[in-house]
Amino acid sequence: MKRVMLFLITNLAVVLVLSVVLNIVYAVTGMQPGSLSGLLVMAAVFGFGGAFISLMMSKGMALRSVGGMVIESPRNETEHWLLETVSRQAQQAGIGMPTVAIYDSPDINAFATGAKRDDSLVAVSTGLLHNMTRDEAEAVLAHEVSHIANGDMVTMTLMQGVVNTFVIFLSRFIANMVASNNSDEEGEGSNMMVYFAVSIALELVFGFLASFITMWYSRHREFHADAGAARLVGKEKMIAALERLKMSQESKLDGTMMAFGINGKQSLTELLMSHPPLDKRIAALRNF
């Protein structure tokens, strides 16, 4: 959850900043949005640009956001085991050794991020290391390594780029129509202000609606990461890890969405979750 939400929030922020900059350029220079084809090209440049900038920033931002400490030289047996386990799994999965970090949190959390399969990050919480058995923790690590091996951050970026493109295109197309109707009654300055306000408002609204698509895709990829972990360490270890997370959720019924997809609510809430419900993931693994 942490990996996906950080990417989506950063992506939205970058796209909005780029959008504001473009609107200021329009206002200062008097340029108009132009033809539909020109608008689509601009939307694609900004949409994919925002997504890929977010991806390139993801590793450093993720570390800073949790106050993670990179393990360069293991200081104890736990850190030694952690590095050794990730190294072994990375070799099995055919990827470069990820940067490994630990961050202080009582929650059972872990995430992976990074722009490249050979330049990635795997971070685990102290809560995970303290509350899981070695077999369970090994399965969680295998799940994160599988995300990297599957190239999930890159495919999510491409998906987000497409979504961004349509969000920007539709927002500005509608804003242009509204501003054009307004220009018959008001001055040019008012026309640009209307265009600016409507385009930003619609980007926020359409961006929220588009998150249903990106969250669906994220849930889809979680099943693949679970299957990848099952291939690396065996499905029983992966099931045990999910069962442990389920027990943790049941002991803390506060509705918190953890990094491994724990949430007590279903229905509409599930559509906005980056991870499928644990019961569905466990059932899928039992049939694997």
Swiss-Prot record:
Task: Give the protein's cofactors.
Answer: Zn(2+)
Query: Can the keyword Zinc-finger be found in this entry's annotation?
Result: no
Domain of life assignment: Bacteria
Q: List positions binding Zn(2+).
A: H143, H147, E222
> Does Glycoprotein count among this protein's keywords?
no
Q: Which GO terms describe its cellular component?
A: plasma membrane
List the subcellular locations. Answer: Cell inner membrane
Q: How is the cofactor bound?
A: Binds 1 zinc ion per subunit.
Q: Topology relative to the membrane, per the entry?
A: Multi-pass membrane protein
Q: Which UniProt keywords apply?
A: Cell inner membrane, Cell membrane, Hydrolase, Membrane, Metal-binding, Metalloprotease, Protease, Transmembrane, Transmembrane helix, Zinc
Q: What InterPro entries does the entry give? A: HtpX_protease, Pept_M48_protease_HtpX, Peptidase_M48
Transmembrane stretches, start-end: 4-24, 36-56, 151-171, 193-213
What sections of the sequence does the record tag as coiled-coil? none
PANTHER family recorded:
PROTEASE HTPX
Q: Which family does it belong to?
A: Belongs to the peptidase M48B family.
Q: What is this protein called?
A: Protease HtpX
Organism in which the protein naturally occurs: Vibrio vulnificus (strain YJ016)
* Gene name, Swiss-Prot/TrEMBL: htpX
